[in-house]
Amino acid sequence: MITTRTARQCGQADYGWLQARYTFSFGHYFDPKLLGYASLRVLNQEVLAPGAAFQPRTYPKVDILNVILDGEAEYRDSEGNHVQASAGEALLLSTQPGVSYSEHNLSKDKPLTRMQLWLDACPQRENPLIQKLALNMGKQQLIASPEGAMGSLQLRQQVWLHHIVLDKGESANFQLHGPRAYLQSIHGKFHALTHHEEKAALTCGDGAFIRDEANITLVADSPLRALLIDLPV
């Protein structure tokens, strides 16, 4: 079963220095029916104004994945670690109790645009605090997984995350690990097909809940960039 969640249905925020779209309840936006999906707690697309920053804050024990779409960001923690990431890169922060984290748009004249996901982390697992990965913009890529398969970022949860780039008319099929997945369009138009012959059309910024499907096929109706989050847990 596929249930779409259009970009217009998502929560919105505009603070001047920050513009955001929230898939699930976050900040001032609250919907008791949308507190996350399986281990996916947050899926935001945010634009930080030139020079803007998120001040240091602590997090619950989650893995925070930032996919940089445009611009360059710097991340720092209270332990003295810092790293920069730019467009075409994904950065994973394995947050720790009592450690605060900040984010800063390094450019003085260009906005920073990125997707941010929070995934519940298994309390027994300890991974590298910061991991970074270059995205392959020419094909499908597994960018995060429980064991760091195929050079992907290593998560503290049973989740597989795919970065998908397709030209118009191309298709891609994915075998899912369990009963749940979430599909997020970054840009482009496409349709998703299930083995039950169910079809859903998505466009830029739309998402879709996938339930009780063994596999999913994406067919690009225009040049496409998307994320598929395989969420058995």
From Swiss-Prot:
Question: Which keywords describe this protein according to UniProt?
Answer: Cytoplasm
InterPro entries reported for this sequence: Pirin (IPR012093), Pirin_N_dom (IPR003829), Quercetinase_C (IPR041602), RmlC-like_jellyroll (IPR014710), RmlC_Cupin_sf (IPR011051)
Report if keyword DNA repair is assigned.
Answer: no
Q: Which domain of life is it from?
A: Bacteria
Q: What is its main location?
A: cytoplasm
Q: Quote any Pfam family the record assigns.
A: Pirin_C_2
Location in the cell:
Cytoplasm
Signal peptide feature range:
none
Q: Which SUPFAM superfamilies match?
A: RmlC-like cupins (SSF51182)
Q: Name one GO cellular component term.
A: cytoplasm
Q: What else is known?
A: Contains Cys residues that are easily oxidized.
**Annotated function:** Does not have quercetin 2,3-dioxygenase activity.
Which PANTHER family does the protein's record reference?
PIRIN-LIKE PROTEIN YHAK, QUERCETIN 2,3-DIOXYGENASE
Q: Which family does it belong to?
A: Belongs to the pirin family.
Assembly information from the UniProt record: Monomer.
Name the UniProt record assigns to this protein: Pirin-like protein YhaK
GN (gene name): yhaK
